[in-house]
From Swiss-Prot:
GO terms for biological process: DNA transposition. One of its GO terms (molecular function) is DNA binding. InterPro entries: Tn3-like_transpos (IPR047653), Tn3_Tnp_DDE_dom (IPR002513). Residues 23-34 have a biased composition (Low complexity). Required for transposition of transposon Tn4556. It comes from Streptomyces fradiae. It comes from the Bacteria. This is Transposase for transposon Tn4556. Belongs to the transposase 7 family. Keywords: DNA recombination, DNA-binding, Transposable element, Transposition.
């Protein structure tokens, strides 16, 4: 197959340069857990005991269980926590010593050999549930189970932790390099530069004054009256110095020159030299963990990353030596100012290099290549090789027909691309023909496209009256009652099942679940929801929290709410569920966490995280993802779309400008979505064409980019395999997008996908120009999401709205609770607003359909979210509470 640049090039499977493993393989050929997990009593669906285990696997398990002291779940003498507690706790602080401890933890867990046990026959969901129970459950609860059940939980937990510990270590390495090394060195360098600025200014002024004298006294100057050229004012060097010293004494001039040599970089330097020089002084941060890094993490690389990986593996041999020669390093990696710092530092002896500077040069390259997946970890799930996960060979051939049919994509590109090119050409001509009559489109002197601002949609008196009447009729309730009532309508509480799978359902479990949702969703903790009744006692809350509330059960409950929201006539008036938007909501994380990132604009001096969530045009939240810091939304949009909790598959996707890139445009279009980002920087957007000679009238200058159809066609099979792998869930879109770019530039395959995306991007811009209604539809959907985020802020009011979670799992769980409370409150509002509209119609009120479509389900004046909470649902004989008199006062 031709044109496989970026995927395969004969360097091993999927184009990967293979290296020998540096992690113990464990028992070779470990048998699977029984031929049939269900029949053998294994970890199949609904089973709580392990299946028969092959002898090599059994030996490995018992070594881990007994030899390591984990199986007793007890606290060793003199210790505060059990061995299990110690090993399942990941790093939280970002520092060199923490990095060393994270690698030691990964090494210790890998030594159990559980990574070699074949668990392929165990249902992944069951394995995930057991490992989650083992990671989060209290040791006292785990001790209550039988030996077989504890062994199964231990094995699932250790298998999970084997790769998770490496994930945690590399997460910490990434944030350590980015924030504590590179960013801190840049900040300190900038401070030093600012501090030295007055000296530089004074020295520069003296030099400028002196050289002005030189020019004035030595340059030829024409007499404008006579045209003659008089002789220079000075005829000797002594005379010139005499003239200079009249304005700047010689000793001050010498001091100014010395100051500039001290405070400014050499001419052949670059802008990075100052902070890189400061970075070298922080070698003590990386010294403790460098040797562990290359021995614990089983690194591998693509051909492009092989040189960096080789340099990384050589670093332990250089550390601590007094003299390292140029032949012992890879000089090709010394880009920019690194060459001077490594090879020509003032303190170096002839024939030696600065190996500390070289170490940081390699780490800077490693950081970049880890993020682009050109260097990866074979014993990690998050930092592994996405190319190895792509559908290939027989697996791709089997999936290919189904993928192409599902996405409506052809196996051959020529006809499809010709049709797309014809559509683009025709749209250009149609819109260009309407430009003279359009007041919406404006071109500046450079031919750049501008839109006239959308006028605010007027709110007629009928809408204001309807909104006031409906809002006045909504019953006044406390948030716990909302949750209990929604549970009674939907049965969403039934989605919360015990992770042990064998536990009898607790009495009044719905009350406990509602209390926990308030505790987490309102960010207030247990204290305000605790009570004397059994469902609200601390022990019950803690037990249910650990065994019933987890990401999988939040998602299952949310799917039920989404389904019920779609069935309400009022929600159907708002939309058909086929338009969705994706946007981020920011949370300050004030506690130390590897999974928080700094951003002064959003988080001040703290770290933070972003909840990237999706909402459809029926106001239902379809799911979301918690990511560290404030990364570009475009990296995660596809993953959020494919990992939704429930509801119809959206067809049109609205995002803000931060979610836009040509590659993302291409991937979303290939995946069957109509991508509609808001383009705040529209005049700077390049429009694209296929036919360079076509005359597109007013768009002639704006359409200055050319789409290369031949490039797309050359890579078509790989493009199909990429989107097929994303569509089937074989690989995360985030990893693919990272893989398709290197150093900010697309790979050949990424460039082909970007060219495909430029067709859709240009069609989107043309539609924005031609259809004000399309622009308004995008704006309405974006405003809908902003309204949801505003309501979320009101709900998540405790602890100043800050997220006190150290680990990503905890963040996802708490934000999962917030998302579920949001959807429950929106469902409550929608159903009662629908009833209010029906009542108003029955009473003869002037209710217009266009006004009903503009009602918002994010009203909150009638919901009490503060104080201590009551979890007793009143009798509702009619199924719903009585609507309030629309003329009643607003007192709750």
């Amino acid at each position: 197959m031709g044109g496989r640049a970026g995927l395969d090039d004969g360097r091993g499977a999927e184009g990967v340069v293979r290296r020998g493993s540096r992690v113990a393989e464990g028992a070779a050929g470990a048998a699977a857990w029984g031929d049939d997990a269900d029949e053998a009593g294994g970890l199949g669906a609904g089973s709580s005991e392990p299946a028969a285990v092959g002898q090599p696997a059994r030996d490995a398990e018992h070594r881990a269980a007994s030899g390591a002291g984990l199986f007793g779940w007890t606290v060793p003498p003199g210790e505060r926590v059990s061995e299990l507690d110690r090993l399942r706790r990941g790093p939280v602080r970002v520092s060199g010593p923490q990095m060393k401890r994270a690698l030691e933890r990964a090494e210790e867990i890998a030594a159990f050999g559980m990574g070699a046990v074949d668990v392929s026959r165990i249902p992944p969901r069951r394995l995930a549930e057991l490992s989650r129970y083992g990671v989060d459950g209290k040791a006292s609860l785990l001790r209550r189970h039988s030996d077989a059940r504890r062994l199964a939980t231990l094995l699932a937990t250790t298998v999970y932790l084997t790769s998770r510990a490496v994930d945690d270590a590399l997460d910490l390495l990434e944030v350590l390099i980015a924030t504590k090394l590179l960013a801190r060195a840049e900040r300190e360098s900038a401070k030093e530069k600012l501090k030295s600025l007055p000296r530089v200014e004074r020295a520069s002024a003296k030099l400028a004054t002196a050289f002005q004298v030189v020019f004035d006294t030595t340059s030829e100057q024409v007499d404008t009256d006579t045209g003659e050229i008089p002789p220079p004012k000075v005829e000797s060097l002594e005379g010139m110095w005499a003239a200079i010293e009249q304005v700047v004494p010689r000793h001050e001039l010498a001091a100014a020159i010395a100051a500039l040599f001290e405070l400014t970089p050499p001419l052949d330097s670059d802008a990075d030299e100052a902070w890189r020089a400061m970075l070298i002084n922080r070698f003590g941060t990386v010294r403790p963990f460098l040797k562990l890094l290359v021995s614990v993490v089983d690194f591998d690389a693509t051909p492009e990353g092989e040189a960096v990986l080789g340099a990384l593996l050589s670093l332990p041999e250089l550390m601590g030596r007094k003299k390292v020669g140029p032949a012992e390093i890879d000089a090709d990696l010394l880009t920019g100012s690194w060459r001077r710092l490594v090879l020509a530092a003032p303190h170096l002896e002839p024939g030696t290099v600065d190996w500390k500077a070289y170490t940081f040069c390699v780490l800077e390259h490693l950081h970049r290549m880890l993020r682009s997946k050109q260097v990866f970890a074979k014993n990690s799930s998050k930092w592994g090789d996405p190319r190895a996960k792509l559908l290939a060979g027989q697996a791709w051939q089997q999936a290919r027909p189904t993928v192409l049919a599902s996405l409506n994509l052809p196996g051959e590109a020529d006809g499809h691309l010709a049709a797309r090119a014809a559509l683009l050409d025709g749209t250009y001509r149609e819109v260009a023909a309407r430009v003279p009559d359009s007041a919406q489109i404006v071109f500046d002197d450079d031919g750049r496209l501008h839109f006239a601002a959308l006028e605010p949609e007027p709110e007629p008196a009928s809408l204001l009256e309807l909104r006031a009447a409906v809002n006045a009729m909504l019953p006044r309730v406390d948030l716990p009652e909302v949750l209990l009532e929604v549970f009674s309508w939907t049965g969403a509480d039934q989605a919360f099942t015990s992770v042990t799978a064998g536990e009898a359902r607790l009495k009044d479990l719905n009350v406990t679940i509602a209390a926990l949702l308030v505790a987490h969703g309102c960010n207030v903790g247990y204290t305000p929801v605790m009570g004397g009744a059994d469902p609200l006692k601390y022990g019950r809350l803690s037990h249910v929290d650990q065994t019933y509330l987890r990401l999988a059960t939040y998602r299952a409950a949310n799917a039920t709410l989404i389904e019920h929201q779609a069935s309400i006539p009022l929600a159907q008036t708002w939309g058909g569920g086929l338009v969705a938007s994706v946007d981020g909501m920011r949370f300050v994380v004030p506690v130390p966490s590897v999974y928080a990132r700094p951003n002064p604009k959003y988080f001040g001096r703290r770290g933070g995280a972003t909840w990237l969530n999706m909402i459809n045009d029926q106001a239902a939240g379809l799911g979301g993802k918690v990511v560290a810091g404030t990364p570009r939304d475009s990296l995660y949009v596809l993953d959020v779309l494919y990992d939704r909790d429930g509801g119809k598959r959206p067809e049109m996707i609205v995002t803000d400008t931060a979610s836009y890139s040509d590659i993302v445009f291409g991937l979303l279009t290939l995946a069957g979505f109509a991508y509609a980002p808001q383009l705040a920087d529209l005049p700077d957007q390049k429009m694209w064409r296929v036919d360079r000679t076509a005359d597109y009238g007013a768009f002639q200058d704006a359409a200055r980019g050319r789409i290369d159809l031949a490039r797309i066609e050359r890579h078509w099979e790989d493009i199909l395999r990429i989107i097929g792998s994303i569509h089937t869930g074989a690989v995360r879109a985030y990893d693919v997008i990272r893989m398709l770019s290197r150093d900010g530039r697309p790979t050949p395959l990424g460039d082909a996908i970007a060219h495909y995306g430029r067709i859709a991007k240009t069609l989107h811009i043309l539609r924005l120009a031609d259809e004000p209604g399309y622009r308004r539809q995008i704006k309405v959907q974006a405003n809908l999401q902003e309204g949801r985020h505003a309501l979320a802020r009101k709900i998540f009011h405790g602890k100043q709205g800050q997220l006190y979670q150290r680990y990503q799992d905890g963040m996802e769980d708490q934000i999962g609770a917030l998302g579920l409370v949001l959807n429950a409150l929106v469902l409550f509002n929608t159903r009662y607003m629908d009833a209010a509209v029906n009542q108003l119609r029955a009473d003869g009120f002037d209710v217009r359909d266009e006004d009903v479509a503009r009602l918002s389900p994010f009203v909150r004046h009638h919901i009490n979210m503060l104080g201590r909470y009551s979890f007793q649902l009143p009798d509702l004989p009619g199924g719903l509470r009585p609507l309030r008199d629309k003329t009643a006062t607003d007192d709750m």
